[in-house]
């Protein structure tokens, strides 16, 4: 049987909208994951059953078994001793929803992907990219269980290292999809100063570093201490004796709540300054309306995010405000990806043609 011929304009639009939907689902997944963490729900399911775990407990006996499993881990005895079954159900549903959404994303990616390939809609370069993204998605599921497993034995919470890895990998997949969607757009290439391309790339890299630091803050609950601003521990820059009291010194960068919060603050200031300079440079360089708009939107989002971060800290991490802070972080990342891709697209005409899009 011969496959039907599909018009290029139509099939590229279909692929783009599918990828946009996948990016939105991943953003939702990150927010649900954030709510799961903030409600202390992440360890409520102590088993990893990729297929049979799709169904929640359906009887009183099954609920009792799930609750008994939770009672065996340190978090229950040290943090939630005396919790009722109804209280357990609340945290269970958060974690179950998070895992179910992950399974749904996997299916929502794989089935259309296979269909698009069967219809011959995907050029070879695009297929390779999408297979890599799918592989990263599978890895993300394994990393999620690796993270949960860290809190089932001696710890009462998951490892902050694994939490940060889980978050950054999710947002790396999200960014790869956003970048790919951009590369499927038919746009004229831009001639922009090299320094704008460099600063956009630096901003994107530092946003990922900041996301990692933010996950460390969350994992260590470092946002619930040193709740003053602009000072921290009584001064703008704490003493080195307080910042680096653990040995070896580099462990403080990941384990010391003061150091982790301090580096998160300093990275925020750095990002804000570079974003402002990038916007000014785009305007002065007359880099084009799209580049200027992108730079201004990015600077505005950075300003909003910094403000939300300060408010979240001063109010000791209320759940709603913390989730808004996390949501705006995704917006900042999206704008950083779009701006970097926009400025680097001038050197990527061949890549866009390899994806089946003619560059103007």
UniProtKB/Swiss-Prot annotation:
Reactions that this protein is recorded to catalyse: Fe(II)-heme o + 2 A + H2O = Fe(II)-heme a + 2 AH2
Pathway: Porphyrin-containing compound metabolism; heme A biosynthesis; heme A from heme O: step 1/1
Pfam families in alphabetical order: COX15-CtaA
Binding-site residues for heme, renumbered to this chain: 264, 325
Annotated compartments: Cell membrane
Membrane topology recorded in Swiss-Prot or TrEMBL: Multi-pass membrane protein
Swiss-Prot/TrEMBL cofactor(s): heme b
Entry keyword annotation includes Iron: yes
Predominant subcellular localization, coarse grouping: membrane
Ranges that cross the membrane: 14-34, 104-124, 130-150, 161-181, 200-220, 272-292, 294-314, 317-337
Presence of the UniProt keyword Secreted in the record: no
MF term (GO), any: oxidoreductase activity, acting on NAD(P)H, heme protein as acceptor
Domain of life: Bacteria
Cellular-component GO terms for this entry: plasma membrane
Keywords: Cell membrane, Heme biosynthesis, Iron, Membrane, Metal-binding, Oxidoreductase, Transmembrane, Transmembrane helix
EC number: 1.17.99.9
Gene Ontology biological process terms, A to Z: heme A biosynthetic process
Assembly: Interacts with CtaB.
Family: Belongs to the COX15/CtaA family. Type 2 subfamily.
Role played: Catalyzes the conversion of heme O to heme A by two successive hydroxylations of the methyl group at C8. The first hydroxylation forms heme I, the second hydroxylation results in an unstable dihydroxymethyl group, which spontaneously dehydrates, resulting in the formyl group of heme A.
Record-linked PANTHER family: CYTOCHROME C OXIDASE ASSEMBLY PROTEIN COX15 (PTHR23289), CYTOCHROME C OXIDASE ASSEMBLY PROTEIN COX15 HOMOLOG (PTHR23289:SF2)
Name of the protein in question: Heme A synthase
């Amino acid at each position: 049987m011969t496959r039907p011929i599909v018009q290029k304009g139509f099939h590229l639009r279909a692929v783009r909208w599918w990828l946009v939907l996948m990016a939105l689902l991943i953003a939702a997944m990150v927010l649900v994951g954030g709510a799961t963490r903030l409600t202390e729900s992440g360890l409520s399911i102590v088993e990893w059953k990729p297929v049979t775990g799709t169904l929640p407990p359906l009887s009183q006996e099954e609920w009792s078994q799930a609750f008994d499993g939770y009672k065996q881990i340190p978090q229950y005895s040290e943090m939630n001793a005396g919790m009722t079954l109804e209280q357990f159900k609340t945290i269970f549903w958060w974690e179950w929803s998070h895992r179910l959404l992950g399974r749904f994303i996997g299916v929502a990616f794989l089935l259309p992907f296979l269909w698009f390939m069967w219809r011959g809609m995907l050029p070879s370069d695009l297929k390779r990219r999408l297979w890599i993204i799918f592989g990263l998605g599978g890895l993300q599921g394994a990393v999620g269980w690796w993270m949960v497993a860290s809190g089932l034995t001696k710890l009462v919470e998951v490892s902050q290292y694994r939490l940060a890895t889980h978050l950054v990998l999710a947002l790396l997949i999200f960014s790869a999809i956003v970048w790919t969607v951009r590369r499927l757009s038919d746009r004229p290439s831009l001639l922009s100063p090299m320094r704008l391309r460099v600063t956009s790339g630096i901003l994107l890299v530092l946003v990922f570093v900041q996301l990692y630091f933010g996950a460390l803050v969350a994992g260590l609950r470092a946002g619930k201490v040193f709740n003053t601003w602009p000072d921290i521990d009584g001064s703008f820059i704490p003493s080195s004796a307080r910042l680096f009291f653990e040995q070896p010194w580099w462990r403080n960068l990941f384990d010391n709540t003061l150091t982790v919060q301090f580096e998160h603050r300093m990275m925020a200031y750095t990002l804000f300054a570079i974003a402002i300079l990038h916007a000014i440079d785009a305007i002065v360089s007359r880099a084009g309306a799209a580049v200027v708009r992108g730079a201004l939107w990015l600077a505005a989002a950075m300003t909003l995010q910094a403000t939300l971060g300060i408010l979240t800290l001063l109010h000791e991490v209320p759940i709603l405000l913390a989730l808004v802070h996390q949501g705006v972080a995704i917006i900042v990342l999206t704008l950083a990806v779009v701006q970097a891709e926009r400025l680097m697209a001038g050197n990527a005409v061949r890549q866009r043609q390899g994806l089946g899009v003619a560059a103007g």
